[in-house]
């Protein structure tokens, strides 16, 4: 993320593009937040996951509309085995609506009941991924796979750098959004690997130091 201190004080800054910083030699701009997901293997399209965030500084929340959108996604793609998972930001009322919905309740998993890294593993194993628009990190995790990615609408509080991410991805043709069909040729992101390679190219001594330490 963009540091609170002047960038000139750092050897290197890794900052998401949506933070809109000016180009500098000591700055790598990334598409989204760095994440541990990165797979070149196309997962089966008959596995799907819906990932739910929650209200934030940038987004309001309409639980009834959200549940309606999820229900439509699953009805429209009934041949897919769907899993629904919430996050720690998801309001309890939203979870209750899903658990009382006859179509969704058996597909729903609460984040507090899931093991560590479950979300990352699920993302890498599903060929269809839908994420609520407020969940920027999960959107870019999904885009770091070969899956077909869709964004579920969440009401924005105002137009800002965060809540314009989803519409911008739609314009690029990278995601399903509403009736839009994404471009099948979207890039398979692996920004963590790209940044690591850039760092090693800039400071090759780091690779030597790591090799020496592994021999100890």
Indicate where each model-derived feature is located:
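A nucleotide-sugar donor-handling region in carbohydrate enzymes
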Residues: 7-63, 178-179, 184-193
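Leloir-type glycosyltransferase catalytic cores
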Residues: 166-216
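Short, charged/polar "capping" segments at the starts of alpha-helices
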Residues: 21-23, 58-60, 89-96, 157-161
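Catalytic binding pocket for nucleotide-activated donors in carbohydrate/polymer assembly enzymes
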Residues: 137-187
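Donor nucleotide-activated moiety binding/catalytic core segment of transferases
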Residues: 99-137
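Active-site donor-nucleotide binding/catalytic segment of nucleotide-sugar enzymes
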Residues: 35-92, 112
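Short, polar loop motifs at secondary-structure junctions
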Residues: 1-5, 14-21, 88-91, 103, ...
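Short internal beta-strands
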Residues: 14-15, 81-88, 150-153
